[in-house]
Amino acid sequence: MAGLGSPLGRLTAVTSEIYDFAAIQARWLPVWTELDPFRASDDPSDPRERRYMLDMFPYPSGDLHMGHAEAFAIGDVVARYWFQRGYNVLHPIGWDAFGLPAENAAIQRNLHPADWTYRNIETQAASFRNYAISFDWSRRLHTCDPEYYKWTQWLFLRLFERGLAYRKASPVNWCPNDQTVLANEQVVGGTCERCGAQVTKKTLTQWYFRITEYAQRLLDDMALLEGRWPERVLTMQRNWIGRSEGAYVDFTIEGRAEPVTVFTTRPDTLYGATFFVIAADSPLAAEICAPEQRAAFEAYVDQVRRLSDIDRLSTERQKTGVFLGRYAVNPVNGERIPVWAADYVLADYGTGAIMAVPAHDQRDLDFALTYGLPVRVVVDTGEGDPAVTGVATEGDGVHINSGLIDGTDKAEGIARITRYLEDIGKGRAGVTYRLRDWLVSRQRFWGAPIPIVHCPGCGEVAVPDQDLPVLLPDLRGADLAPKGISPLAGAADWVQTTCPRCGGSAQRDTDTMDTFVDSSWYYLRYCSPHDPSQPFDVAKVRQWLPVHQYVGGVEHAILHLLYSRFITKVLHDMGLVDFVEPFSALLNQGQVINQGKAMSKSLGNGVDLGEQLATYGVDAVRLTMVFAGPPEEDIDWADMNPGALGKFLARVWRIAGEVTSPVGAPPKDGDPALRRVTHRTIREVTELVESFRFNVAVARVMELANALRKAIDTGPGPADPAVREGAEALAVMLSLFAPYTAEECWARLGHQPTVAKAGWPTPDPELLAQEEVTCVVQVNGKVRERLRVSPSISEEELRAAALAAPAVEKAIDGRPVQRIIVRAPKLVNVVV
């Protein structure tokens, strides 16, 4: 029993005469903290079905903002619903705490990154508690804690052992402002996604994860996610992985012993190749350049290195190049074609070289017309000559000027020419991917050190597991400003070490890991966040994972989500997890915008979350977030009215306080009409919450509140047991969206905390049967669905219900709806 000094011991009857959200919040927050009602059980004998609800963990850049308020309100609806249904729910919280923003912010304030980061974490933690998110706080983690990044380093070493972590010198994306490298996924429109600086190229020796080894599996396993992840995200990942089928073709370069291989999706156009292009910044171009062209080539390469990949691939920009003074030999006709270095071919894409077919590729045509190179049509599409029109003909047609495959169509031409190349030993069928290996090195301080030692005799040597973590040196007072090399390189005592293999003098690797490595496995650590002996408890992971519902922004589609899928597959191959996809279902929430635009300081349209919470209260803000519309859509805060929702909450609070029937009064003795309304609402809200139509669920809760208000004022009155039944159901359902008010209502109705564990109400089928009729839904006169609806359903409600039915959506199949005939409550006919 709670002591008198505890919040529970001090609870007294509600005596306030007005709805005071601040007083209600102050009353219940310490009670919840003491009760800790959302702690998940790891007990394998616990008979409850398990559910894992996960929000993408936040970055501690400051206090919570409006985007956090929306995303976490959405995830909390799911978690609280599962708690009410009696599941054993894991709903953890942590912080993605390493990274550039914290380091830069700390440098600007003359602080150590750790001080800045942990201060922000505590601020956000207090705000999350106030915002009443149903977290299991016992599982809290921070990726910048040595107890966490020890296991991030352990993960790196497991990839290193399997040949999936490796080091190579190559051109990388370089942010001149942050003075560090960027993965391809972190370059947006040619600029750094973090600071907006124009990205350039720089050749560095860097660490990579061999994600390309898993490219096909990443594609194939998307079948497991169909219908459970947004199609937009799956499409983005498919496009980013970029599988292409075609052929590898070997070209002999005169004066070079080894052939140069290109990949093409159209080997049938080989007869139209009139020149050969190599990426200007590739080692191959420098190798084969003729002496007489060397000066021109080197001057040209200096120009190209100033361009971003986005610039080089732009269709708007004129293509440039330089002749290398060499010729390649076309393997199908023996023709000598000139070899050029150009900016529109990238060294790290494909093989870094292409056969140029200007008649049938627009970039090749633009280049050919600029430099007066031949244009030969080899596919007759019935269109004009590209050399005259300036437009390449890229469609299908009949092959002409193509020797062995004249007169064939595309499919037959590809098959024949590929077989011929295989027969003569000059090519083979193949597949290539757009996906590049994951660049994980960063030249900054605030990250997990790479656990590798560089020994003059032994080379790259892994730090033994028993010596993990490789701790960051403190470096307090050191200049951490970006200089193009890691600040760790200046920590001489830290850098100098002993080789674990030979015992000789060696140096630590001075780069730190991309923070996406930290977040690629955090969902596993939550299962045993304080285990000092292993990254995660395998048995517990098998109990909880994969995550049942993941909530977060679409901006992570080709970053965190792809990387986590890759790491999960690696761990599966190691036998540590028994699933291949980490997140069974994904919901991408929309953005919170203002006046039609994303919030930003430059536009002056930012909305301060703290001010909104102080003005309207937590529940009104949370309710606004879920009532604004479908969770996937943006919320324009300028159009929202949290004050009106605050008034609704006050009405619910008053209803709970006016109920006079005793706790446990038999509902069957109550007004049957009101009971039917209550049970219909329970059924509909259940269906709506399970289909993530939270805004409509809130509308149904509002309708029940209106029915209760009417019943109290002009109906059976506050003593009727049906009023109590409805008010109790209202409090439980409202707890998903407005937990403080719901808890207060639960107390006013005579119950002990907490309403979150009251149990979800079950609709009585007998009451529902008494008030339902069957509505036939037709599409173009053909019956596609039968709905059970209320006899009093409005035309608008019936129209919405019919259009939302999956069978009707499938029958419409995206076609424009011409008109909808509604004869409530028994018929809807959709004409498309």
Swiss-Prot record:
A motif ('HIGH' region) lies at residues 58-68. GO terms for molecular function: aminoacyl-tRNA deacylase activity; ATP binding; leucine-tRNA ligase activity. Transmembrane segments: none annotated. Keywords: Aminoacyl-tRNA synthetase, ATP-binding, Cytoplasm, Ligase, Nucleotide-binding, Protein biosynthesis. The keyword Aminoacyl-tRNA synthetase applies. GO terms for biological process: leucyl-tRNA aminoacylation. Its EC number is 6.1.1.4. It is found in: Cytoplasm. It comes from the Bacteria. Belongs to the class-I aminoacyl-tRNA synthetase family. This is Leucine--tRNA ligase. It comes from Acidothermus cellulolyticus (strain ATCC 43068 / DSM 8971 / 11B).
